[in-house]
A protein has these predicted regions:
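Aromatic- and Gly/Pro-rich donor/ligand-binding loops
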Residues: 1-84
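Structural motif
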Residues: 30-34, 64-66, 93, 143-145, ...
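Alpha-helix capping/helix-boundary segments
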Residues: 38, 98-99
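Catalytic donor nucleotide-activated moiety binding site of glycosyltransferases and closely related
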Residues: 61-70, 102-103, 153-188
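Acidic anion/phosphate-binding donor-loop and adjacent secondary structure
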Residues: 71-77, 119-133
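A short beta-strand/loop micro-motif in the catalytic core of glycosyltransferases
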Residues: 89-96
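Helix-loop-beta element that forms the nucleotide-linked donor phosphate-binding surface
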Residues: 100-118
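Conserved catalytic-core segment of nucleotide-activated headgroup transferases in glycan assembly
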Residues: 129-171
């Protein structure tokens, strides 16, 4: 919180829809997209990318730091859409070599491979920012981190829960629980 307060201009307002972002005057110098698998085509079930992850809601300068595609290739039907989005960035980077190659092949732009931002801090720095609420499970627990719908994980997690007796903690931004008794942590 101290770092955010001292170094970042974060809006007090929560935006729930693309049009809310597009309508509001955003008091920022630039729009930064990244990291994780924000450009993974598999997380978009309708076969189209989500324009919010490309910052298209604003005419401000756009930069991408360490985005990941999570796949070796982009489906042919999504390549033109991706090129249009990538063309709007003044600076691009990628979290892995294959992402850099995708950007080069589709948009003709160089994108250096950069370190995942989670690895830019030491363990002590992370611990100083970590939330240690009293309601986290004591002792061991099964941690599940999902990028998209839990689907096939649900029966496996149920089996693990039954075998170990450990509670399930779901660490992700999706709203669908992987296990009926999972504790969800939405702001990981």
């Amino acid at each position: 919180e101290k770092f955010s307060r001292d170094h970042l201009r974060i809006s007090d307002r929560r935006y729930g829809r693309f049009d809310e972002l597009a309508e509001g005057p955003l008091p920022y110098d630039l729009i930064l997209s990244g990291s994780d698998q924000i450009w993974n085509p598999k997380i978009f079930p309708d076969g189209r990318f989500d324009p919010v992850f490309f910052g298209t809601f604003s005419q401000k300068r756009r930069i991408a730091y360490a985005p990941s595609f999570g796949v070796p290739t982009i489906p042919e039907g999504m390549q033109a859409e991706l090129k249009g989005y990538l063309d709007g960035f003044s600076h691009l980077s990628a979290r892995e070599t294959q992402g850099s190659a995708i950007i080069r092949d589709i948009a003709g732009k160089d994108a250096p491979v950069v370190l995942d931002p989670t690895l830019l801090l030491t363990a002590d720095q992370w611990d100083s920012m970590a939330d240690h609420p009293a309601n986290y499970p004591k002792g061991g627990y099964i941690l599940c981190y999902c990028i998209n719908r839990p689907g096939a994980l649900t029966p496996y997690l149920e089996w693990l829960h039954q075998e170990t007796g450990l509670p399930v903690v779901q660490l992700c931004g999706i709203r669908q629980k992987v296990h009926p008794k999972a504790k969800q942590i939405m702001d990981a």
